[in-house]
Amino acid sequence: MKLPIIKGFDEAALKKYFVNTGLLMIGRIGSLAIKMATSIYVANYLLPEKNGVLSTSTAYVFLFAALAGLGLDSFIVKELHQFPKKRDTILGTSFLLKSTAGIICIPLIFLAWQIFPLSNIAYSIILILSFTGLFQSFTVVDAYFQSEVQSKYIMQVQIAGNVISALIKFLLVFVFKAELIYFVYAYTFDILLVSVGYFLMYNRKGRSVFTWNYDKELAKKLLKLSWPLIISGIMVSVYMKIDTIMLKEILGDDIGTKASGTYATVVMFSEALNFIPVVIVSSLFPAILNARRDDPERYQKRLQNLFDLMVWLSLAFALFIAVASPLIYKFYKPEFIAAAPVLAVHVWGSIFVFLGVASGQFLIAEGFNKLTFIRTGFGAVINIALNFLLIPTMGMMGTAIATVIAYFSATFLIIFIPKTRPQGIMMLKSLFLVSAFQKIFKR
């Protein structure tokens, strides 16, 4: 297929990154379709209360996911891109750091539970889920394939993993009529399954994990670079997942658990395409880094084009979901119908998520790692404060409103910081379609 010529990109590079991004998209969309279908029949089987227990428990453990990941993924890609001959050292060091962090998170989650337990939820559920942080350490192989612009292998692993996961849950629902605890095991197994798949694919491509090695100085370098992103990631986890927990705890055991189970379906649809900016930015990040190094003017153009693309994609998605929300809940049992108007509000936060992902890579490229912590921390504080204010009177709708405002606040905080204000203005131009109209009138 002949690709159109786009200013700022040479044709060969464009084709390479277009194909890579397209493959990632296919993999994620295929996985998404499988996951959404699975989530619908699992939610209809568990009903709001049990679904609330599962969603609140996973949200609780997710708060520690950033600590387990150490915020290393972007830096691993960057290191592999700059020093490809040090592949085994970079991957080995990163794997040891992430697996150690995953192990440490297990007792940390236990200590957190002693101080802040969730009402009417057994710790055994939390304990099982706490192993997901350890299993996610294997995603260093994902970073390797990203750096090589070989996303077809990531796609293959994800689709295979999701098909197997869907089959397991199908059996639990329709054959075994399983209890809730088995779905907890299944969720944890999902993470392990994909992680093992990455390793098998890595070995299949002629690589071996047994050649990996650890470098103490590299470990220090990575941790020094990533600690702001660790804290930032924790803050992201807080303002992405704390709403589910607060909804349950503020509204009380029975009402709160059912509300969180219903709200989980909102979040699933609203955040369904949040992988798109991650895929696009992950695939284009090497090209953006090259432009920053070789041609500052092209670098700025690529950033503006990226912000424009994020707005157009997220705007189309938000409009579609907002209009289709009543139809979406036709697939659910009547117990979930109250979530339809909540989804129509919550989905508008995706615009700021898309822009936030794109601007986050800009911050990394420019070395403004600490700012990622500042802005996400700000968003988390806004989200928590608004949840306390709105949930008692508005319930799920209050949570949705708080989330949208928090996403907006976190993304556009950079406009108030002098050294990042130009990029904040670029995002505003994209948000209000100013940049798009400028391009139209220049033709």
Predicted segment positions?
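Interhelical loop/hinge segments that connect adjacent transmembrane helices in multipass membrane
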Residues: 1-17, 152, 180-184, 198-240, ...
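Signature of the first transmembrane helix
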Residues: 3, 13-73, 106, 110, ...
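Interfacial segments at transmembrane-helix termini and the short loops linking adjacent helices
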Residues: 10-14, 113-129, 251-258, 304, ...
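Transmembrane helical elements of multi-pass membrane transporters/channels
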Residues: 20-35, 160-161, 165, 186-198, ...
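Interfacial/gating helices of multi-pass transporter permease domains
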Residues: 38-63, 123, 180-181, 185, ...
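Helix-loop junctions and terminal segments of transmembrane helices
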Residues: 39-40, 68-85, 206-207, 266-300, ...
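Membrane-interface junctions at transmembrane-helix termini in multi-pass inner-membrane proteins
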Residues: 79-84, 134-158, 181, 347-375
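Hydrophobic alpha-helical transmembrane segments
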Residues: 126-130, 155-204, 378-382, 396-420
